[in-house]
């Protein structure tokens, strides 16, 4: 469907019988209305042609071959009004055969049938709206219980109230006699109801707004009845379950009102028939036919429905029990078609294989939506494993050359022809296959101004697909910055991602303005940061900054390093400041240079000259040691820093005790903050 903003969208929900009939019915040029499937047949066993009014009828669903009718006559498909549009002999229109992919049919049911999704799925929508136990409604639907219809201001013949069991001994012999007695049909139809008819009558009498009001009042009253101090835990649980039920009932009624859906639409009088191309019959080697399970389930419904029609046409001689039993069989056949085995034993074929119902076709990872529609293969797309690219910017991704050449091949051909490296498309493709150096140069130019979209299934929210600026990388895997993984719910243990190329200018503009990864830093649901370090990033940061958190205490005053456990005398040379002299550096560049030259290790403690800090100047911390020098200066050694003072006790310099990991992390943070400040100043 197309909304007011001309956006194509798909909405799934209940529809009225009138809308269902409008979708399935077609009016032929001679005025005949077709669309109802009345026969359970598919193809004729001799001619291999679709049976008329069957599940593959060409009058209902359109011709198998474009422009060829069932008689074999051929007409060119034109728009001229004078040309005959259908065959007068077989009634098949001369139209495109692609109509068989979307043209529906319908089965007119001889009795009302409840939709299994709304009755048997938990929570049951029908039981929720009617506020009745699910078992009672199922017994009513399948004919085990009858329902007394409310008769207003009229005398009642049977004086029944509510539902009553058909198996009660007092009714067991009288009800069949009553049903078959001539002249009592009026009383029977007025005062007794069973099956899906009883469900539909109760749903049609509902006022959704009154349901919402009464449910809200009851919910408020239950909130006041809570037992103090949890005296009766069982009653509290019972009240809690009832309150949760009322909340679900209010939300369901609100949804029905908002979407303009009537509750009685959950009971079917017409059963839609899928287009034939979505439930095909294929001929394999040896002349055998392979059919979709849906066809067999449709045939089962039509067989039982036609049997019920025959019984109803001879109602005067048909026992009422037989009619009720046949209605139950029709209900079960429709349940199997919609959801085989829902809360029961599934139907199987002769090879003990479970039939795939309509629910099995559309649900799950291999269903119609996730595999065929959302996960289908499209042009200008590729797929590969993702690996970590920590050196990438947040808005960049690494694209393997093999994938990039295929995705941007049309752009490469245009670039080669424009720059006169190829005279035609064939020569350009030849150069691309040979992967000449000029191809990589043009590919770099093309990729600089063209974003790509990365998607990881399942796409559960809008951050499941984001835009990136691609760069060429070696190998066959897509490189991704680790900070964007949380939005995709991805990790680097073999996950695969799809890459798409936006072609139109509108798509490229949307990708640049709205979908770039560095513009999607917050969760759209709760506005929390989505680009946060996780897993191996946290481990890396821990290792980078772990170092020695005890300062100089770890070497000098660590009891594990002292041999005083046996009251041994410790030599004075063990009280040196360190076993190995810790180096001093004037700036961070010298420290990193020493690490690169392998003069120190990554976590080796060192002293780094630092700017004067007011917190240290005003600190009243007592130094651990004081080292005096011959020139009169002295060093005050604290737990994590060292102060150099002159003879006049003036603070000359400060050294902090750190390592290369801390220095590297600090520099990264400092550069990021400075870059943010520059960007903020440009915006102002």
Curated annotation (Swiss-Prot):
Keywords: Chloroplast, DNA-directed RNA polymerase, Magnesium, Metal-binding, Nucleotidyltransferase, Plastid, Transcription, Transferase, Zinc. Zn(2+) binds at residues 69, 71, 87, 90. Its cofactor is Mg(2+); Zn(2+). Binds 1 Mg(2+) ion per subunit. Binds 1 Zn(2+) ion per subunit. Its EC number is 2.7.7.6. It catalyses: RNA(n) + a ribonucleoside 5'-triphosphate = RNA(n+1) + diphosphate. One of its GO terms (molecular function) is DNA binding. Belongs to the RNA polymerase beta' chain family. RpoC1 subfamily. In plastids the minimal PEP RNA polymerase catalytic core is composed of four subunits: alpha, beta, beta', and beta''. When a (nuclear-encoded) sigma factor is associated with the core the holoenzyme is formed, which can initiate transcription. HAMAP family: RNApol_bact_RpoC1 (MF_01323). This is DNA-directed RNA polymerase subunit beta'. It comes from Phaseolus vulgaris.
């Amino acid at each position: 469907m197309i909304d007011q903003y001309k956006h194509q969208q798909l909405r799934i929900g209940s529809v009225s019988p009138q809308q269902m009939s409008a979708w399935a019915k077609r009016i032929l040029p001679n005025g005949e209305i077709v669309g109802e499937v009345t026969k359970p047949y598919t193809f004729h066993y001799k001619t291999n042609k679709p049976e008329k009014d069957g599940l593959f009828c060409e009058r209902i669903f359109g011709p198998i071959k474009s422009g060829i009718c069932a008689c074999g006559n051929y007409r060119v498909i034109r728009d001229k009004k004078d040309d005959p549009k259908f065959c007068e002999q077989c009634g098949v229109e001369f139209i495109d055969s692609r109509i068989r992919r979307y043209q529906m049919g319908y089965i007119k049911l001889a009795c009302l049938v409840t939709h299994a999704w709304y009755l048997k799925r938990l929570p049951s929508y029908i039981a929720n709206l009617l506020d009745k136990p699910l078992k009672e409604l199922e017994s009513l639907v399948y004919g085990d219980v009858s329902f007394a219809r409310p008769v207003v201001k009229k005398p009642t013949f049977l004086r029944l109230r509510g539902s009553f069991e058909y198996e009660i001994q007092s009714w067991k012999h009288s009800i069949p006699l009553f049903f078959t007695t001539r002249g009592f049909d009026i009383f029977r139809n007025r005062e007794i109801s069973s099956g899906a008819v009883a469900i539909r009558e109760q749903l049609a009498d509902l006022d959704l707004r009154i349901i919402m009001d009464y449910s809200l009042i009851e919910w408020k009253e239950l909130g006041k009845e809570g037992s103090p101090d949890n005296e009766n835990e069982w009653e509290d649980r019972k009240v809690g379950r009832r309150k949760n039920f009322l909340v679900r009932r209010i939300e369901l009624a609100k949804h029905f009102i908002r979407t303009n859906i009537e509750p009685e639409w959950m009971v079917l009088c017409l059963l839609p028939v899928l287009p034939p191309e979505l439930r095909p019959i294929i001929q394999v080697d040896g002349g055998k036919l392979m059919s979709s399970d849906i066809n067999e389930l449709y045939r089962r419904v039509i067989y039982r429905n036609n049997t019920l029609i025959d019984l109803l046409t001879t109602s005067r001689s048909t026992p009422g029990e037989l009619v009720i039993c046949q209605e139950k069989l029709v209900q079960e056949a429709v349940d199997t078609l919609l959801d085989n085995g829902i809360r029961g034993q599934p139907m199987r074929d002769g090879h003990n294989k479970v039939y795939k119902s309509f629910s099995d076709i559309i649900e799950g990872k291999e269903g119609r939506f996730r595999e065929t529609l959302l996960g289908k293969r499209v042009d200008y797309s590729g797929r590969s494993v993702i690996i970590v690219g920590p050196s990438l910017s947040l808005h960049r991704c690494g694209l393997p050359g093999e994938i990039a050449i295929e995705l941007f091949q049309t752009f490469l051909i245009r670039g080669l022809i424009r720059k006169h490296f190829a005279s035609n498309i064939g020569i350009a493709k030849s150069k691309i296959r040979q992967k000449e150096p000029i191809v990589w140069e043009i590919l770099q130019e093309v990729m600089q101004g063209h974003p790509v979209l990365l998607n990881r299934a399942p796409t559960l929210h809008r951050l499941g697909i984001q835009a990136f600026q691609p760069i060429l990388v070696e190998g066959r895997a897509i490189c991704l910055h680790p900070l964007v993984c949380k939005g995709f719910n991805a990790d680097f243990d073999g996950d695969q991602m799809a890459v798409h190329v936006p072609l139109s200018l509108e798509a490229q503009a949307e990708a640049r303005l709205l979908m770039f990864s560095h513009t999607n830093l917050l969760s759209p649901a709760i506005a929390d940061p989505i680009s946060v370090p996780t897993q191996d990033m946290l481990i890396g940061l821990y290792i980078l900054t772990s170092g020695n958190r005890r300062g100089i205490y770890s070497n000098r005053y660590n009891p594990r390093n002292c041999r005083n456990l046996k009251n041994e005398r410790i030599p004075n040379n063990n009280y040196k400041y360190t076993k190995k002299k810790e180096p001093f550096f004037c700036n961070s560049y010298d420290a990193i240079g020493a690490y690169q030259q392998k003069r120190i290790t990554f976590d080796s403690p060192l002293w780094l000259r630092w700017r004067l800090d007011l917190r240290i100047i005003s600190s009243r911390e007592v130094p651990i040691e004081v080292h005096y020098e011959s020139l009169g200066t002295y060093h005050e050694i604290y737990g994590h820093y060292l102060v150099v003072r002159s003879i006049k006790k003036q603070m000359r310099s400060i050294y902090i005790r750190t390592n290369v990991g801390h220095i590297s992390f600090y520099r990264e943070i400092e550069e990021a903050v400075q870059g943010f400040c520059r960007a903020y100043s440009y915006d102002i």
